[in-house]
Amino acid sequence: VALIMLNILAGFEFDGDDPLDVRRLHLESEAARLAYRDRDAHIADPAKSAVPTETLLSEAYAAEQRALLRDDRAMANVPGPSLAPSSDTIYLTVVDTGGNAISFINSVFSLFGTGIVSDNTGVLFHNRGSSFVTDPDHPNAIGPGKRPMHTIMPGMLAKDGEIVMPF
């Protein structure tokens, strides 16, 4: 998803280095909408599904997606797969002055997770499984021996062995 976003954004010129420039934030948000649409439609366990990685990361595809974006308005609609209603989660990323970084997700997903608490431990059970795809024809369908893509996948970007950015 990050690479799809970066490929789309690579075709834009940004004035200066201000990370909070309104146009920059707008285009980053729109690129994210397109990349997450592609994630939900295509990204799956490549050992079990044909994931069109070369297409999704190609310059031609990025140019097609870039053509959908406008500086003066957001896309009215991003067509994509129909997913179950989503909820929120908590994500934490920290980088210290020494360059050490963490990328951490801890979630019960919906408010109070499943609403089920263990009698023995008092632990609240999560319901993150509601985000898995159960349609057997979908490339990311959950199944035996598969590693389906899920939203709880914190990442770390490195260059030349050095941490650049957690996400």
For every predicted segment, state its role:
Residues N100-M165:
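Active-site rim segments in enzyme catalytic domains, especially the processed small/beta chain
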Residues V1:
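Conserved phosphate/anionic-ligand binding catalytic regions in large, soluble enzymes, centered on
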Residues I4:
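Protein kinase glycine-rich loop
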Residues G11-V108, N120-T121, R128:
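Internal maturation/activation junctions in enzymes
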